[in-house]
């Protein structure tokens, strides 16, 4: 239950704005609204059935308007239960007996290929998760000369040089030389966090020819190249060549349509720019790519876009935090500020908007969960507006399976009507009425490419109310209803194209043609 403020509400002020039309990642000429789904959550069961779940869900996903899915890391991690963010062998997609298992947490390579085939047959694209920052689960240790650094300032060395035993020897005995004969050794990395000889955990910076932190990364903690495990050295030419080769192989082997880049702020920016370009050139495909640069600062994200020559998109982290704040202030958030400091307001064509993900869900390291009551409002905000490429979280659709008392319930019944609104009605010019601390709204006039298209949306974090909004002259005389089912009244669009639309307390309503 949200706390509501007593307020005299006046909704007559009209704020009109024209936003940049965003070409969709599906095709450059497609008239269909693109919608991405992150098809996993952190606590996806370790039952080896996830690729089968994805295949079985392909028709449903297409029907509700999902045009692309982001799959979890598909390669062998340091154990069968690893989510893929502790990558051991990027060439083992659940095909070889390694780390005590053939399958990954999610299933086998052939099952994944079958799932992708089913998705493609229904015009749903597939984006692979790319974890390039580090490697984990080495087969043996190696002697390395290293120094300790200050975790709060990785440029500050806090010890003399000494020998450590680092887990940096990757031989891949189960795969051998299949697909690649490249073996990883200490000189392919520039740091680690464990000395096996002393059984101590530190951040170790390696010594040796050319060894230093990659400098073109986030400046947090002095230099944020190091994150975890054995940190890959993208100043090493053999590493650069091998990783480009793998990216091309990965895209072709799974017929991928794009990528999600993990931990981008910890990886040399110019390398990521060149890596994306190399894969695009080799495959001849657009390979839509979105980078996870976790920073609640649009300026930092804009800097990353600049450093990578705008050849990638980024997740709109500032918008996520605005939505989280709006959900947690008991009706006290000024809804006129939802777009303040966001990527979608600065670079709408490069913003992947989202409400929740596997890192922000309850119990995770970046936990910043949007409260359940607000999620339908948040999804309406990212799914029915013209700017940004919106993403739906698996955990919001199907619920999360962790042990926190705050686990996310399935919101499928709330989200699917909003997806239907996006798929069938959210087209044409947009008019914004973001002019009140509680109740904000927007309309879409519709266009000729989608029959009966056009909509009017209202959301409020506090008291309900109404707004008079312009729906377009072409919609004059039509009767519109609330597709969410939250209100039973209908609205007749006047001869001047205007209508009076209503919303309940702490709720969302999306009106479309009957």
From Swiss-Prot:
Binding residues annotated for Na(+), in chain numbering: 190, 214, 225, 231
GO-annotated cellular components: extracellular region
Keyword annotations: Calcium, Carbohydrate metabolism, Glycosidase, Hydrolase, Metal-binding, Secreted, Signal
Cofactor info, note text: Binds 3 Ca(2+) ions per subunit.
Gene Ontology biological process: carbohydrate metabolic process
Keyword set includes Signal: yes
Cellular compartments annotated: Secreted
The protein's name in its UniProt record: Alpha-amylase
Naturally occurring in which organism (per UniProt): Bacillus amyloliquefaciens (Bacillus velezensis)
């Amino acid at each position: 239950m949200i706390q509501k403020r007593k307020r005299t509400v006046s909704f007559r002020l009209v704020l009109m704005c024209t936003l940049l039309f965003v070409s969709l990642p599906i095709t450059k000429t497609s008239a269909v609204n693109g919608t991405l789904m992150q098809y996993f959550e952190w606590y996806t069961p370790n039952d080896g059935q996830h690729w089968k779940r994805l295949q079985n869900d392909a028709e449903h996903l297409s029907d509700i308007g999902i045009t692309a899915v982001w799959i979890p890391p598909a390669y062998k991690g340091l154990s069968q239960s690893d989510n893929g963010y502790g990558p051991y062998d990027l060439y083992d997609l659940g095909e070889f007996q390694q780390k005590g298992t053939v399958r990954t947490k999610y299933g086998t390579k052939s099952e994944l290929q079958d799932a992708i085939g089913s998705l493609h047959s229904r015009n749903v694209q597939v984006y692979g998760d790319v974890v390039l920052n580090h490697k984990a689960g080495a087969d043996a240790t190696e002697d390395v000369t290293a120094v300790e650094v200050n975790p709060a300032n990785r440029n500050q060395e806090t010890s003399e040089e000494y020998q450590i035993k680092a887990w940096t020897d990757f031989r891949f005995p189960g795969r051998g030389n299949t697909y690649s004969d490249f073996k990883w050794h200490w000189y392919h990395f520039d740091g680690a966090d464990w000395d096996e000889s002393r059984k101590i955990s530190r951040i170790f910076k390696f010594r040796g020819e050319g060894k230093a932190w990659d400098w073109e990364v986030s400046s947090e903690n002095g230099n944020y190249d190091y994150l975890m495990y054995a940190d890959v050295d993208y100043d090493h030419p053999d590493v650069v060549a091998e990783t480009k080769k793998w990216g091309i192989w990965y895209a072709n082997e799974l017929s991928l349509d794009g990528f999600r880049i993990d931990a981008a702020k910890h990886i040399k920016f110019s390398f990521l720019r060149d890596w994306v370009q190399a894969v695009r050139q080799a495959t001849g495909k657009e390979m839509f790519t979105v980078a996870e640069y976790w920073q609640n600062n649009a300026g930092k994200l804009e800097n990353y876009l600049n450093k990578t020559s705008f050849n990638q998109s980024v997740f709109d982290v500032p918008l996520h935090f605005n939505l989280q704040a709006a959900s947690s202030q008991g009706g006290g958030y000024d809804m006129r500020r939802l777009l303040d400091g966001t990527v979608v307001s600065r670079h709408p064509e490069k913003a992947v908007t989202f409400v929740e993900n596997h890192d922000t869900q309850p119990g995770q390291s970046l936990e910043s969960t949007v409260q359940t009551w607000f999620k339908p409002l948040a999804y309406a905000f990212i799914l029915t507006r013209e700017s940004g490429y919106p993403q739906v979280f698996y955990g919001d659709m199907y619920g999360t399976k962790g042990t926190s008392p705050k686990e996310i319930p399935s919101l499928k019944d709330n989200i699917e009507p909003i997806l239907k609104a996006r798929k069938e009605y959210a087209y044409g010019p947009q008019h914004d009425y973001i002019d009140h601390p509680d109740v904000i709204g927007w309309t879409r006039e519709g266009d000729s490419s989608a029959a009966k298209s056009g909509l009017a949306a209202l959301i409020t974090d506090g008291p309900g109310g109404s707004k008079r909004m312009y729906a377009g002259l072409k919609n004059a005389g039509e009767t519109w209803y609330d597709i969410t089912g939250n209100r039973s009244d209908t609205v007749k669009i006047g001869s001047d194209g205007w209508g009076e639309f209503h919303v309940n307390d702490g709720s969302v309503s999306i009106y479309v043609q009957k």
